[in-house]
């Protein structure tokens, strides 16, 4: 598992997160949820366990599964089951951050097809967010994605398929500091305190900063606002303004899927919900 910002803490330790998620399903969308923690790291065994209990349920929300295993698990279950399956860490985050991005671009007076985007993080949430940005009009050539080794370039060996999709042919940028110069948008789904005030100052006019690492953002709200007054800033935390949180996404997309007896949650549904 990959539980919030806590990493692999085990299935049992992740139970409070799952119980909380179930409560939010009930409060916001009236959906009764059973949280089931699966103590299994082998993707095939996990898939078979989920398939075995699937007849009991109207839909399955996958949670806190690390990349790249999460991609295989979700894709297989979507193909092999006839009920909606969604990995919330990927798509819930993508839907809500996309809605936030479109609003921020409107405030900044910019168009999604023209902006330069820097994505710090290459896990499940980061890649899913960025793919939805592309579906909404962002250009792949305007996107730089970084992992723990720096900017992901096409000449790097042993890239996963999700990283290959966003690998750049550029060879003039390697670090976050280099990548972010002149950028319009920063999306952080990585770790805390990696974005400095100087980096924010080096961005384009009216920069959009989504520092979504939990529990510590890539840069604090106060530091970003102090760096420059024109920044459009959001985090994943409820104690700062402009929170980007899956809770305004996942309950309702499942409510819609269940009410319409949909057999899957597709890209069109995700794009429709962000509006």
Please place each PLM-identified region on the residue numbering:
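N-terminal ligand-binding/catalytic initiation module
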Residues: 1-83
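General beta-strand structural signal in soluble alpha/beta enzymes
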Residues: 35-36, 61-64, 85-88, 119, ...
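Rossmann-like adenosine-cofactor binding region
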Residues: 164-232, 237-241
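Short beta-alpha connecting loops at secondary-structure transitions
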Residues: 82-84, 115, 161-172, 231-236, ...
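Active-site nucleophile and cofactor-binding loops and adjacent substrate-binding regions
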Residues: 39, 86-95, 118-122, 238-240
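Adenosine-phosphate binding glycine-rich loop
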Residues: 88-89, 108, 211-275
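Glycine-rich phosphate/diphosphate-binding loop of Rossmann-like nucleotide-binding domains
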Residues: 3-29, 95-187
């Amino acid at each position: 598992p990959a539980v919030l910002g806590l990493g692999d803490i085990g299935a049992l330790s992740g139970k409070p997160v799952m119980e909380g998620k179930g409560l939010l399903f009930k409060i916001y969308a009236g959906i009764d949820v059973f949280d089931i923690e699966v103590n299994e790291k082998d993707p095939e065994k996990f898939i078979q366990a989920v398939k075995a209990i699937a007849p009991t349920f109207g839909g399955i929300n996958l949670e806190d599964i690390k990349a790249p295993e999460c991609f295989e698990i979700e894709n297989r279950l979507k193909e092999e089951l006839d009920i909606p399956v969604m990995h919330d860490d990927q798509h819930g985050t993508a839907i809500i951050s996309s809605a936030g991005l479109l609003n921020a671009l409107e405030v900044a007076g910019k168009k999604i097809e023209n902006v330069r985007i820097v994505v710090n993080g290459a896990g499940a949430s980061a890649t899913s967010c960025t793919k939805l940005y592309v579906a909404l009009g962002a250009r792949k050539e305007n996107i730089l994605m970084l992992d723990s080794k720096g900017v992901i370039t096409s000449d790097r060996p042993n890239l996963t398929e999700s990283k290959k999709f966003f690998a750049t042919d550029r060879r003039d940028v390697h670090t976050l500091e280099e990548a972010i110069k002149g950028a319009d948008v920063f999306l952080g789904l990585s770790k805390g305190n990696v974005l400095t005030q100087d980096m924010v100052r080096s961005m384009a006019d009216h920069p959009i900063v989504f520092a979504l690492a939990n529990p510590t953002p890539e840069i604090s709200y106060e530091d970003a606002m102090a760096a420059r007054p024109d920044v459009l800033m959001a985090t994943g935390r409820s104690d700062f303004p402009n929170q980007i949180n899956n809770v305004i996404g996942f309950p309702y997309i499942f409510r819609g899927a269940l009410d319409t007896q949909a057999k899957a949650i597709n890209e069109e549904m995700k794009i429709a919900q962000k509006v």
